[in-house]
A protein has these predicted regions:
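Structural signature of alpha-helical solenoid repeat scaffolds
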Residues: 86, 118, 149, 179, ...
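Repeat-solenoid scaffold signature
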Residues: 258-320, 325
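Residue-level detector of extended alpha-helical repeat arrays and alpha-solenoid scaffolds
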Residues: 78, 110-113, 141, 171, ...
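Hydrophobic core positions within HEAT/HEAT-like alpha-solenoid repeats
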Residues: 82, 113-114, 130, 142-145, ...
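Amphipathic alpha-helical scaffolding segments comprising HEAT/armadillo-like alpha-solenoid repeats
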Residues: 59-70, 90-103, 122-134, 152-164, ...
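N-terminal alpha-helical scaffold/docking segments in eukaryotic complex subunits
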Residues: 1-111, 115-126, 135-141, 145-155, ...
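Long, acidic/serine-threonine-rich intrinsically disordered regions with weak helical/coil propensity
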Residues: 2-19, 170-171, 176-187, 191-225, ...
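Amphipathic alpha-helical blocks and their helix-capping loop/short-beta junctions
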Residues: 308-365
Length: 448
């Protein structure tokens, strides 16, 4: 039987670990919400650090308790335990037990492990993920690759064989990892695997080849768009991020193709060419609400107009038939509330009036991003702005890599302190090269 002081101490450890797990989940929700400045998440990072420091004071006893919580049904407690055992590193007792538990975890707990391990890895903590990368379980392999992106001791060459794995999810995760680690010497090998030797071209992997500077992918994307068939969204995104003015007719054509219309509208926002604005305004006349919202989102991405509207959404809940008067069997969906929320304006007339009044100030650049010329300097500026959405920051980060040929990772959901360091590196780089690239809107992979 535990002494009262031991029970109290274990209770404190549980509270610290559960709090870490809760805060990890909360910070993820904040990043996805869009209404909280991303820099404010630093406060949650500080609270996680405080709980972590308290656990480190607990030494082996705290670690032992974290190992025990790997079997917990409490998701927050499990998430916190995984994070703590990852943070202490491979040489510490408890880390190996966590890795072993990860390899045997059931599918519905994989996300919890991945979330905790990614956050630890994003802070440059060493995680013994090598053994997991040898797993035969595709789901586990995919999760391990997502974590390994941030593990400095996992080299791109190490995961190259997984680019030919039987599972498409594993292949995609492996190619993404290699691209985001900036392993440009591996590009010819990846081009052969993705474009030549595969039974069919995986457009998602093709996009990651673009991130590594592949011109062959651009040729394939242009050919796919010219065929006029159903166009995979990733082909359009390849052209959008490469940003060549010569590709403008392909976007116009894709918007007019019903089979590729939605993907084309989304890609138009990334492409950002000012001549697409009237086409996007015309798309707001669509009967389909999702199509109108997609077109409006693209318009906002280009112009930064800030036009909004109030919309309503019905919330429904499923209740057992026994709880509903007049029903006898099966589940019944009952609308229990209607929520009003603010979203980007989808009214064609308002956008047309705004564009007519503001068209004259959009002559300084062919491409625009949130109302500013789409230069690399603007991308970096928006990357640092506290009010920038996670969607905008991810978009700008990717295009910075594609158009500059640099590989400075800035994970949109990583520790805020690490993000600020990465942004600082981008700012320093731009300060050195801006005289050369200030007026270059079509730079691709540092080669023009």
């Amino acid at each position: 039987m535990l002494a009262p002081i031991q029970k109290f101490t274990l209770g404190l450890y549980s509270e610290h670990l559960t709090s870490i797990g809760f805060l990890l989940d909360l910070r993820q929700a904040y990043f996805g919400a869009g209404d909280v400045p991303w820099t404010k998440v630093a406060e949650l990072d500080s609270r996680i650090e405080a709980h972590r420091d308290a656990l480190e004071l607990g030494g082996p006893d705290a670690t032992h308790h974290a190992v025990q919580l790997l079997a917990s049904d409490d998701t927050d407690a499990l998430r916190g335990a995984v994070y703590h055992l990852a943070w202490i590193g491979p040489k510490a007792k408890g880390h190996k037990e966590m890795i072993t538990a990860w390899m045997g975890v059931v599918e519905d707990r994989l996300t919890t492990y991945k979330q905790a391990l990614r956050y630890a890895a994003q802070a440059h903590r060493q995680i013994d993920v090598g053994v997991v990368l040898k797993s035969v379980d595709p789901l586990l392999l995919e999760a391990a690759l997502k974590v390994s992106r941030f593990c400095e001791d996992v080299k791109a060459e190490q995961v190259l064989p997984l680019c030919s794995h039987d599972a498409v999810t594993v292949r995609r995760a492996a190619v993404e990892l290699i691209a985001l680690k900036g392993a440009r010497p591996l590009l010819p090998t990846l081009e052969r695997a993705v474009l030549d030797e595969a039974k069919s071209v995986d457009e998602r992997n093709s996009f990651w080849l673009l991130v590594l500077g592949s011109t062959r992918v651009l040729q394939a994307a242009r050919e796919a768009c010219r065929r006029g068939e159903t166009i995979a969204p990733q082909w359009l995104m390849c052209l959008a991020y490469a940003g060549s003015a010569a590709d403008l007719p392909l976007f116009t054509r894709a918007v007019g193709n019903p089979a590729s219309r939605l993907a084309a509208l989304q890609a138009c926002g990334v492409f950002g060419h000012v001549e697409l604005v009237p086409l996007l305004i015309a798309a707001l006349a669509a009967a389909d609400e999702f199509e109108r919202v997609t077109a409006a989102t693209a318009l906002e991405t280009i112009t930064g107009a800030g036009l909004t509207e109030q919309a309503v959404m019905a919330l429904t809940t499923e209740v057992e038939s026994a709880d509903v008067v007049g029903t006898t069997d099966g589940n019944t969906k009952v609308a229990d509330d209607v929520v009003e929320f603010t979203r980007i304006c989808t009214v064609q007339g308002e956008w047309a009036a705004w564009w007519s009044a503001n068209l004259s100030r959009f002559g300084a650049s062919p491409r625009w991003r949130r109302g500013k010329p789409a230069t690399l300097g603007v991308f970096i500026e928006q990357l640092a702005e506290p009010s920038s959405s996670d969607q905008l920051r991810r978009m700008n980060q990717l295009e910075l890599v594609v158009r500059s040929g640099m590989s400075i990772d800035c994970a949109w959901d990583g520790p805020v302190a690490e993000q600020l360091v990465a942004i600082g590196k981008w700012q320093q780089w731009w300060k050195k090269v801006q005289a050369e690239h200030a007026n270059d809107y079509w730079l691709f992979a540092g080669r023009g």
